[in-house]
Curated annotation (Swiss-Prot):
Location within or outside the cell: Cell inner membrane
Function: Responsible for the transport of dicarboxylates such as succinate, fumarate, and malate from the periplasm across the membrane.
Family: Belongs to the dicarboxylate/amino acid:cation symporter (DAACS) (TC 2.A.23) family.
Record's protein name: C4-dicarboxylate transport protein
Record keyword Transport present: yes
One GO biological process term: L-aspartate transmembrane transport
Source organism (scientific name): Serratia proteamaculans (strain 568)
Keywords: Cell inner membrane, Cell membrane, Membrane, Symport, Transmembrane, Transmembrane helix, Transport
Recorded name of the encoding gene: dctA
Length: 429
């Protein structure tokens, strides 16, 4: 029994995170030098994301009986994303107005170092709904795979899947080849995941070593408020959605506990995307639904990022004594409904979208971003964790609404019954 615990990925990653925190705190210089370990692991995962999405989506769509079902799944998923992410934005706005973590700081924007956020402001100028939509279309198929752009790969995979489906029996050979290639890809993922503890250790040691615990204490009220809001959103909002669709949010969180720990260590929900695709299938969701909902959700269903954006923007206004009436806050909400859709599930993207939003609203001081910059890394963990749970719940819900969910397998797996999907997931180590 003890040996089984030591071999579990959950235990290994938890131990690695703890060691990373200790190293970063007591030996910050050494901890800061551990960054390549975390970066290397995330790069290994990114290397495999494009082929995983391609194989999953193509085999899922090509294997469906009707193409109308694919269109229906996509429409339902986008509707769900819009409703839930809007709720997340509203909850963030409500809590930050009630708690007011920035009130009383009385910071003069002119005294802040705007140079520190200049690079983010420059990137933010490139944000916009039209450039975002045009960017979904790749310049070339090879370019989409080379850059690892999730939505570009997804678009090509959907078109490829449709074309393969129309070939019928003539395309069976290609279908079999892609399915076999998919098995090889997931074999590679299994090997990469053995390095997850090392990646989590390096990323956490770097974060604590570079930014220190002091930066946590300095703006602790905002961080605590944000973390509690994310917990509230998962338990109350996602919990209610899960319950209404026949499963427990707590059992679901337990099911993906290893993925949550990896995300906690790396601060990026993208680091477990391939593994989530596999686990959601094991949970009883059809491959076609998983292949569409999970990758799309990484741009359109970022609940944690939505909460962060409203809270951070209003916090800057409170800290700099910038008055925001109802009209200003409604304007902020409308802008965020568009700009938040461009925040991919990678570390730092939320901060860039925040910069874009503040630039678009115009009422808030852009220099106020310097207040958030020092603690953004610590807030990214809660963002990524909430995003991951949100996308997992969305997949189950959309699968159920589209009648593409094996509910018996869902309940057996979440209850950890022998022979269920819970004991068929990728080996840990």
């Amino acid at each position: 029994m003890k040996l089984t615990i030591f071999k579990s990925l959950y235990f290994q990653v938890l131990t690695a995170i703890t060691l990373g925190v200790l190293l970063g705190h007591f030996y910050p210089d050494i901890g800061a030098q551990m960054k390549p370990l975390g970066d290397g692991f995330v790069k290994l995962i990114k290397m495999i994301i494009a082929p995983v999405i391609f194989c999953t989506v193509v085999t899922g769509i090509a294997g469906m009986e009707s193409m109308k079902a694919v269109g229906r799944t996509g429409a339902i998923a986008l509707l769900y994303f819009e409703i839930v992410s809007t709720i997340a934005l509203l909850i963030g706005l409500l809590i930050v107005n009630l708690v007011q973590p920035g009130a009383g700081m009385n910071i003069d924007p002119g005294t802040l170092d705007a140079k520190a956020v200049a690079v983010y402001a420059e990137q933010a100028q490139q944000q916009g709904i039209v450039p975002f939509l045009l960017d979904i279309i790749p310049g070339s198929v090879i370019g989409a795979f080379a850059s690892g752009n999730i939505l570009q790969v997804l678009l090509f995979a959907v078109l490829f899947g449709f074309a393969l489906h129309r070939l019928g029996d003539k395309g069976q050979l290609i279908f079999n080849v892609i399915e076999s290639f998919s098995r090889v890809i997931f074999g590679i993922i299994n090997m990469i995941m053995r390095l997850a503890p090392l990646g989590a250790f390096g990323a956490m040691a770097f974060t604590i070593g570079k930014y220190g615990v002091g930066s946590l204490l300095q703006l602790g009220q905002l961080i605590a408020c944000f973390y509690l809001t994310c917990i509230l959103f998962v338990v109350v909002v996602l919990g209610s959605i899960a319950r209404a669709n026949g499963f427990s949010i707590f059992k679901f969180v337990r099911y993906i506990k290893e993925e949550l720990l990896i995300v906690l260590g790396t601060s990026s929900s993208e680091s477990v995307l391939p593994r989530m695709l596999d686990k959601m299938e094991k949970l009883g969701c059809k491959k076609s639904v998983v292949g569409l909902v999970i990758p799309t959700g990484y741009s359109f269903n970022l609940d944690g990022t939505s909460i962060y954006l409203t809270m951070a923007a209003v916090f800057i206004a409170q800290a700099t004594n910038t008055h925001m009436d109802v009209i200003h806050q409604v304007t902020l909400l409308v802008v965020l409904l568009l700009s938040s859709k461009g925040a991919a599930g990678v570390t730092g993207s939320g901060f860039i979208v925040l910069a874009a939003t503040i630039s678009a609203v115009g009422h808030l001081p852009l220099a106020g971003l310097a207040l958030i910059l020092g603690i953004d890394r610590f807030m990214s963990e809660a963002r990524a964790l909430t995003n991951l749970v949100g996308n997992g719940v969305a997949t189950v819900v959309v699968a159920k609404w589209c009648k593409q969910l094996d509910e018996k397998q869902l309940h057996d797996t979440l209850s950890n019954k022998p022979g269920s999907g819970a004991d068929k997931t990728l080996p840990s180590a």
